[in-house]
């Protein structure tokens, strides 16, 4: 499974219904599980973004489908990145051409 990091920003709608955010997060986790996606961590944050989700999915299509569904509800905007652990990154670097 591949690891992904999604940054979350509340929309105006999401802010107007901020008290429902924990309930929406629980529903999101349940939907992700049904889709075969494992939510590793979910955080609300201070700073440039309002939250972050770390999850594992079988491929980019599954990850994209999950975050598109989340964004389509209108409460958040998302930015998703593929994340690599130290072992994965070492393998990538070992295969890159040296200049």
Enumerate the predicted regions with their spans.
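A compositional/biophysical signature of low hydrophobicity enriched in polar/charged and small residues
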Residues: 1-99
